[in-house]
Amino acid sequence: MRFRLTEGNFIRIGAYKEGNTAVFTFAAQKEDECNIVLTDIVQKKKYNIEVPAQYSLGSLRSVRIHDFDCEKFSYYYLLNGVRHIDPYATIIYGREKWNDCDRAKKDYEIECGIDKPAIDWKKDIQPEIGRDRMKLYKLHVRGFSMDTVQKNKHAGTFEAVSDRIMYIKKMGFTSLLLMPVYEFEEMTVPIKHVVPDYVKPKYSQMRTETEPGHLDKADEKVNFWGYTRGNYFAVKASYANEPSDAANEFARLVQRLHKNNMECIMEMYFPDNTDHNLILSALHYWVQRFHVDGFRLLGDKLPLTAIIQDAMLSRTKILHDSFDMSVVPKDRRYENLYIDRAEYQFPARMMLNHINCNMNELLNQQRKQGENIGFINYIADNNGFTLTDLFMYNDRHNETNGENNTDGPSWNFSNNYGFEGPSKKKFVRDIRAIKWKDAMLMLFLAQGVPMIMAGDEICNSQSGNNNAYCQDN
C-alpha cells in the first residue's frame, strides 16, 4: 500500500482526521529520524512511513496522509529507532480489558488510534451550578458499580454509572466528581534494564526461567485509582461496555448528567515534569470534545496562571489547593475557582472524635467562604479512612496492600470507641451511628461546598484500609 504525503499542520499537536486525510504532528528535533508505524487493525500488517525533515517547524514534525481511513489503522512513532506512544493520542489500543494478565505475552505493548466524534451536542446545556447550591459526590467508575446487588452485563462501566444518576440526584447532589477516567496503566509493568554484555552470561544463569507471559500472582498489584502518568486525551476503554466506543459512552454519560441538571467534574493528575502545553491542551480537549464542567487538578508545578487566564476555561470549574487571585481577570463574571485541600478534614475529625479540638479553628472552617472563590469541604476522601472507618478503627489496617502496613496516613484522628473494627455491642454501634450522623450534619451545614466519597452514605467500610489504591474488590 502506498501513501501520499504532504506537509501537515503545526498549529495542532496530535493525530486527527481532517476531511479524507489524517494529520500527524509530534515533537521531534529536525535532526531526528522519524517514522510513523501504521498497523492494519484487521490484517495486522504494518506499514513504516518515513516523515522527512523538510516537514519540520521548530521542534515539531508534521505530515498529512491523504485518502486515509483512520478507523482501519493504529499507530505509534519511531524516533531514532525508539518506539514512542503519542502523548496526544485520542484512543489507546491494548488496554480494552481491565487488568488483563494476558498482556504480558505481548510485553504490555499499546498502540494509538484516532477518535471519531459521533455525538451531537447541539441541544446540550451545561448547568453552571453556583457554589451556593453545589454538592459533590465523588466516585470511581469501576468501584461504584461493581457490587453484586445490581451486577449486570455493564457493571463497572460508564453506562452503569449513568443508570444510577437518579440515585445520586435524589440524595441532593448536583455534581459528579470522577476519579481518573482517561487512559492509564493499571497493571504493574516490569521495568526493563539493559544488561551490559560482560555480565550477560552470569545474569542469565541467575535468572529463574518462567513460562512466557506468566505473572506471579503474589507480585501482581493493580493501580486501581489511576493517579499516575496517563494518556490524557483518551477515554479509558476498560470503563466502557463496548471498549471500541468508550469515548461516545463517556459523552453520553455527560449528556445525561446535563439533562438532569447535574455537572461532570474530572480528576486529573499530572506529575511534576508534565509538559505545560500538553496540560492546557488536555483541558481544552475534554471541555470541547466532552463538555465536562470542571477539573480537580492534582499535582505540583501546574501552569495555574495560564489555566486561570485561559478564555476557553473561564466557565469551567477548577479545583486546586491554592490560587494566586491577583492573576484572575478583572472582568471575570463566573466564579469558577475552588480551593480544595484537607484543611476542613482534620479540625472536623478532631472535634468529632474529641482529639485536641480547637473550636475556634473548627468554627472558622464552618463559616469560611471567599468573595470570588469557593471552598471544597470533606471529612473523608479516597486517601484515608472512609467515614464509617473513622469511627471504627484507631489504627490503619493496610496489610492486604502487601507493604507490611507501612503505607497510608499514620495520623487519622480516628476513634474506635472501645473496640477495633466491627462490634456487636449495642453501645458501641449506637455511638458510632451518632458520630456518623454528626459528621454528615456538620459537613452539610458548613458554608463551603460539601463533598462525600461514594459509599459513605451507606456506611461503607474498607476494614480499616486507609490507602486502598490497589484494592479492586
Please report, for each region that a protein language model flagged, where it lies by residue:
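Aromatic- and acidic-residue-enriched carbohydrate-binding clefts of CAZyme catalytic domains
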Residues: 150-156, 188-259, 270-289, 400-421, ...
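Conserved alpha/beta catalytic core and glycan-binding cleft of carbohydrate-active enzymes
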Residues: 104-105, 291, 304, 308-454, ...
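The feature marks proteins involved in alpha-glucan
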Residues: 1-21, 46-50, 55-138, 145-150
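Active-site neighborhood of glycoside hydrolase catalytic domains
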Residues: 248-328
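Conserved, mostly hydrophobic/aromatic
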Residues: 26, 139, 168, 178, ...
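Hydrophobic faces of well-ordered beta-strands that scaffold small-molecule active sites
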Residues: 135-137, 176-178, 264-266, 295, ...
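An acidic-aromatic substrate-binding cleft motif
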Residues: 115-184, 202, 223-226
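Short proline/glycine-enriched turn/loop motifs at strand-loop junctions of beta-rich domains
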Residues: 27-33
